[in-house]
């Protein structure tokens, strides 16, 4: 048995899609355990680019069992579009299964998402307006509608009617927005029910049986540790649990099943939307790094804010996830930047500390304390071993390991599958 959890160790967009793709080739089962279509994973197969939002990255390998787990909130419209797009490009999607316990996103969730964000005004949190938060709210309030409800149309229809009555009243009286038509929703979702029925399964049983049979299981996370509902920069976070503990809840396995936890770390730091960002690089230098790294959101297209590597947040990620290894991505983007800066600690009101603060107000006041390292100018995209990398590049990697206390196992030196240096394979 081998169970590996892959998590983002920063604010998401770390390059998890590429690392998941690499590990999926070696896994038997790939399960997505949280989030929704607000996530976007980009995978390069040769010179062909695939952008996935809900379907696990393992779908690009024939014969893999790919599962959308119970911790996901599923927008069936997005899923059907994604499946059709993959089929049109010759990808076999027959290995996909959807948890009957996963919750559904309905049209009114998206309407609420947009209305609530607009209502926040200057305090907006940067939601993608895809209905993720409101769907998780319904789940926590125990009024959510699950994928398994699509199998009982009478039950599904009654639940939608009940929820819609309350939601339409909320939209009208609080947000001064039009409501949604019940019949239109039922007609739309009847089509999804017919289409998705063969894919709906007891995913908890599937994944636990696979582990009992000694198969290799990869738990694919979305977003990142700093977007976790509890461990992230609250309230500028997502509505689920991207950390390793979320894999147990969102896939339905016990914590003793997990063997390794790999944190995906971008060689610099990025974040999308609002919230404090101590190592952010502003002005032309930040713009140049954004263009060099092609830092624009897979889901939204929004430009990402860019900054230097921050090992304060990485130590926090190492602790809350129990990281056993790091997959370092986009190292090639740093080529030509000299010197390089690594944040080793924060200065807060004159005091230097290495801990990541829970208080958003405190984090906004934190000033990064930097250590400078010499950069490199050699092209590293063809490197396939550690020895192929320039000495200053290896020094940067070693310093990351020293400051986080976590060994680097994988290094991405380009977007393609083959542009990966393997120091230790998780499987």
UniProtKB/Swiss-Prot annotation:
- Does Cytoplasm show up as a keyword for this record? yes
Print the keywords alphabetically. Cytoplasm, GTP-binding, Ligase, Magnesium, Metal-binding, Nucleotide-binding, Purine biosynthesis
Q: Which Gene Ontology CC terms are recorded? A: cytoplasm
Q: Which cofactor does it need?
A: Mg(2+)
| InterPro entries recorded | Adenylosuccin_syn_GTP-bd, Adenylosuccin_syn_Lys_AS, Adenylosuccinate_synth_dom1, Adenylosuccinate_synth_dom2, Adenylosuccinate_synth_dom3, Adenylosuccinate_synthetase, P-loop_NTPase
Entry similarity comment: Belongs to the adenylosuccinate synthetase family.
Q: Where does GTP bind?
A: 12-18, 40-42, 304, 330-332, 412-414
Outline what the protein does. Plays an important role in the de novo pathway of purine nucleotide biosynthesis. Catalyzes the first committed step in the biosynthesis of AMP from IMP.
> Which pathway, metabolic or otherwise, does it act in?
Purine metabolism; AMP biosynthesis via de novo pathway; AMP from IMP: step 1/2
**Where in the cell is the protein located?**
Cytoplasm
Which reactions appear under catalytic activity for this entry? IMP + L-aspartate + GTP = N(6)-(1,2-dicarboxyethyl)-AMP + GDP + phosphate + 2 H(+)
Q: Which gene encodes it?
A: purA
Subunit structure and binding partners: Homodimer.
Gene Ontology molecular-function annotations: adenylosuccinate synthase activity; GTP binding; magnesium ion binding
State the protein's name. Answer: Adenylosuccinate synthetase
Binding positions (IMP): 13-16, 38-41, 128, 142, 223, 238, 302
EC numbers, comma separated:
6.3.4.4
Per the UniProt record, the source organism is Moorella thermoacetica (strain ATCC 39073 / JCM 9320)
């Amino acid at each position: 048995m081998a169970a590996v959890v892959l998590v983002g160790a920063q604010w998401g967009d770390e390059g998890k899609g590429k690392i998941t793709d690499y590990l999926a080739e070696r896994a038997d089962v790939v399960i997505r355990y949280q989030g929704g279509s607000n996530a976007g994973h980009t995978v390069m197969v040769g010179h062909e680019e695939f952008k996935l939002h809900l379907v696990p990255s393992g779908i690009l390998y024939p014969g893999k069992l790919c599962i959308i787990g119970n911790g996901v909130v599923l927008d069936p419209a997005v899923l059907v579009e994604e499946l059709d797009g993959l089929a049109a490009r010759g990808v076999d999607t027959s290995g996909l299964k959807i948890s009957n316990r996963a919750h559904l996103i309905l049209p009114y969730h998206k309407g609420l998402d947009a209305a609530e964000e607009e209502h926040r005004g200057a305090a907006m949190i940067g939601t993608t307006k895809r209905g993720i938060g409101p769907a998780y709210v319904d789940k926590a309030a125990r009024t959510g509608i699950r994928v398994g409800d699509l199998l009982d149309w009478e039950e599904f229809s009654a639940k939608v009617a009940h929820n819609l009555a309350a939601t339409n009243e909320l939209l009208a009286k609080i947000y001064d927005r039009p409501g949604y038509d019940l019949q239109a929703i039922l007609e739309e979702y009847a089509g999804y029910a017919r289409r998705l029925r063969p894919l709906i399964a007891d995913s908890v049983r599937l994944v636990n049986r696979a582990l009992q049979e000694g198969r290799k299981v990869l738990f694919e996370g979305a977003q990142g540790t700093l977007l976790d509902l509890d461990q992230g920069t609250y309230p500028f976070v997502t509505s689920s649990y991207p950390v390793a503990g979320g894999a147990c809840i969102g896939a339905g396995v016990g914590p003793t099943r997990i063997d390794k936890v790999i944190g995906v770390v971008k060689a610099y730091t990025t974040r999308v939307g609002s919230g404090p960002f101590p190592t952010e690089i502003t002005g032309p230098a930040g713009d140049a790094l954004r263009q060099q790294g092609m830092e624009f959101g897979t889901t939204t297209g929004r430009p990402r804010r860019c900054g230097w590597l921050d090992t304060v947040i990485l130590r926090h990620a190492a602790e809350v996830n129990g990281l056993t290894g790091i997959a370092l991505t986009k190292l090639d983007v740093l080529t030509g930047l000299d010197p390089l800066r690594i944040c080793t600690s924060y200065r807060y009101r004159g005091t230097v500390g290495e801990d990541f603060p829970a208080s958003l107000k405190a984090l906004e006041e934190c000033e990064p304390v930097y250590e400078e390292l010499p950069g490199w100018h050699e092209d590293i995209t063809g490197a396939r071993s550690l020895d192929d990398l320039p000495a200053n590049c290896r020094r940067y990697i070693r310093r990351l390991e020293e400051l986080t206390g976590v060994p680097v196992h994988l290094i991405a030196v380009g977007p393609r599958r083959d542009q990966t240096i393997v120091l230790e394979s998780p499987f």
